[in-house]
Amino acid sequence: MKDVVIVGALRTPIGCFRGALAGHSAVELGSLVVKALIERTGVPAYAVDEVILGQVLTAGAGQNPARQSAIKGGLPNSVSAITINDVCGSGLKALHLATQAIQCGEADIVIAGGQENMSRAPHVLTDSRTGAQLGNSQLVDSLVHDGLWDAFNDYHIGVTAENLAREYGISRQLQDAYALSSQQKARAAIDAGRFKDEIVPVMTQSNGQTLVVDTDEQPRTDASAEGLARLNPSFDSLGSVTAGNASSINDGAAAVMMMSEAKARALNLPVLARIRAFASVGVDPALMGIAPVYATRRCLERVGWQLAEVDLIEANEAFAAQALSVGKMLEWDERRVNVNGGAIALGHPIGASGCRILVSLVHEMVKRNARKGLATLCIGGGQGVALTIERDE
């Protein structure tokens, strides 16, 4: 099979819920990244074979949002596109599908990633088609129902984090300390400009003025142990998961340009990283956050690596309880994990996050001249994904 490489990796800044990017649809955000990948790599738009983008919240978004992003991003009508929904893993699963297409010879160049605007997810009337003949109708929040609700246990996925905290003995103090560390690492990374190479600025309007958004909006400058300790539990009055030690609701997009190694050589493009292996697993939905343990083990087994060999890891922080449970099971070196902060600080635009962590991983590996990297996420509904990449020595 053909070797698959990444030659471009970009993302938008991550916007707060109803924040700086709220006025831009997921398609608009995704199209900016598609356009920037073409411009920065110099690959002719007509040479792209397919676009694969994850998006979870598609109610009201129009037909095939990935196709919309491709065309709006400057690709010709001849380039096909597909939108996928693997919840939080969508953006990473898109890379897996792209890898398979290239390995099988069905495509030479694919743009893969994810996009999401959680701020614009609509409320829906589920009985409007059949009609409510008498009485009131209830609006359903598609953001929660389609993105954050466990369909099997009929509760918010935050409850699954409480389940993990009890199962693995993760205290409130440990969760808050983890969350504060994520905030501190993210703020230090932003202050040092470590994300600048991966971010595509977004032009937006505010009070009649044009603003350039080029920095992640979510990280807190005022995060403190005392402030985190004052927050009430969000999902269980006697629990430990709070808004401060959980990931947030966000807007953003991320994508990579992938191609066969032979095509990269023919186009004289530098290789940022090689795709080595991918794995997906299923677990009990009530303990969905532990799935990265099994996805990571399967992925490492497929590539023939030991965890200790991996130089850098990006593991999506759905909740501090979840991240700590995974770390406890895998016994990985925390100094190699989410070195610039994770989703608790940076945010979690669900359809984009899988690719966002991969983009950040690639750029940090380049900066550190690291060789082996791992990206992994848990997925609402009881699944997990992992992907390994490698850079040449």
UniProtKB/Swiss-Prot annotation:
<feature type="active site" description="Proton acceptor">
    <location>
        <position position="378"/>
    </location>
</feature>
<dbReference type="InterPro" id="IPR016039">
    <property type="entry name" value="Thiolase-like"/>
</dbReference>
<dbReference type="InterPro" id="IPR020613">
    <property type="entry name" value="Thiolase_CS"/>
</dbReference>
<dbReference type="GO" id="GO:0071271">
    <property type="term" value="P:1-butanol biosynthetic process"/>
</dbReference>
<dbReference type="InterPro" id="IPR020615">
    <property type="entry name" value="Thiolase_acyl_enz_int_AS"/>
</dbReference>
<protein>
    <recommendedName>
        <fullName>Probable acetyl-CoA acetyltransferase</fullName>
        <ecNumber>2.3.1.9</ecNumber>
    </recommendedName>
</protein>
<dbReference type="GO" id="GO:0003988">
    <property type="term" value="F:acetyl-CoA C-acyltransferase activity"/>
</dbReference>
<comment type="similarity">
    <text>Belongs to the thiolase-like superfamily. Thiolase family.</text>
</comment>
<dbReference type="Pfam" id="PF00108">
    <property type="entry name" value="Thiolase_N"/>
</dbReference>
<feature type="active site" description="Acyl-thioester intermediate">
    <location>
        <position position="88"/>
    </location>
</feature>
<keyword id="KW-0963">Cytoplasm</keyword>
<dbReference type="GO" id="GO:0003985">
    <property type="term" value="F:acetyl-CoA C-acetyltransferase activity"/>
</dbReference>
<dbReference type="InterPro" id="IPR020617">
    <property type="entry name" value="Thiolase_C"/>
</dbReference>
<dbReference type="Pfam" id="PF02803">
    <property type="entry name" value="Thiolase_C"/>
</dbReference>
<keyword id="KW-0808">Transferase</keyword>
<dbReference type="InterPro" id="IPR020610">
    <property type="entry name" value="Thiolase_AS"/>
</dbReference>
<dbReference type="InterPro" id="IPR002155">
    <property type="entry name" value="Thiolase"/>
</dbReference>
<keyword id="KW-0012">Acyltransferase</keyword>
<feature type="active site" description="Proton acceptor">
    <location>
        <position position="348"/>
    </location>
</feature>
<dbReference type="GO" id="GO:0005737">
    <property type="term" value="C:cytoplasm"/>
</dbReference>
<dbReference type="InterPro" id="IPR020616">
    <property type="entry name" value="Thiolase_N"/>
</dbReference>
